[in-house]
A protein has these predicted regions:
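Active-site microenvironment for binding and transforming phosphate-containing groups
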Residues: 1-196
Length: 196
């Protein structure tokens, strides 16, 4: 189960007790609460590609970073296109997607073992996958839509952690974040057939 924390600005963050108990990683799943965006994007819009001002979105990131206890400068945003591409994030990527242009594209999963780097991915109805290697102190975060799920993005993210950091299954904690449920998901038969 997820635990909700709400700060003084009413920023609502959902956290996994299993990850918190390790004291190895700061993590969260943001909600739509506590931001400054207006209209149909209110209030915690974190997408620079939607119809909202850059200043509002940047302020939302500042609020999330404060509530989480990280710096905006340390955040690295994915560039999601429903692929299974995994980016090994290094210090040189800090601020990418927020404070400066990303030098990468088509990335739906991020991994790192660099302390202080904050991985950021985006979700609406897709599935967030959080990975923590408790021995090698590496993390992964994957955006798993139906295509990524069929094409095994979680497995590919773990494989990237294995090859880059020596991660082993017995040292991993994996958490599945909030996503759409079967009651609300509408999909075509040809999509459902891909899961068989």
């Amino acid at each position: 189960r997820l635990k909700e924390e709400v700060d003084a600005n009413l920023v609502s963050l959902l956290k996994f007790p299993a990850l918190e108990a390790t004291n190895l990683v700061k993590h969260a799943f943001s909600t739509r609460m506590g931001g400054v965006s207006t209209g149909y994007l209110s209030s915690m819009n974190l997408s620079f590609t939607k119809e909202n001002s850059y200043d509002n979105v940047l302020e939302n990131y500042k609020r999330v970073s404060k509530a989480l206890g990280v710096d905006v400068e340390d955040m690295v945003l994915s560039y999601q296109t429903h692929t299974t591409n995994v980016l090994k994030v290094e210090s040189k990527h800090r601020g990418s997607g927020i404070l400066r242009k990303r030098e990468y594209g088509d990335v739906d999963a991020l991994i790192t073992n660099e302390k202080g780097v904050c991985l950021v991915t985006f979700f609406a109805d897709c599935v967030p996958i959080y990975l923590l290697d408790t021995k090698n102190k590496a993390i992964g975060l994957a955006h798993s839509g139906w295509r990524g799920t069929v094409e095994r993005i979680s497995e590919k993210t773990f494989a990237a952690m294995q090859s880059n950091y020596g991660s082993r299954a017995e040292d991993m904690i994996a958490c599945v974040g909030p996503s759409i449920c079967a009651d609300w998901y509408e999909g075509a038969v040809e999509v459902a057939d891909k899961f068989r």
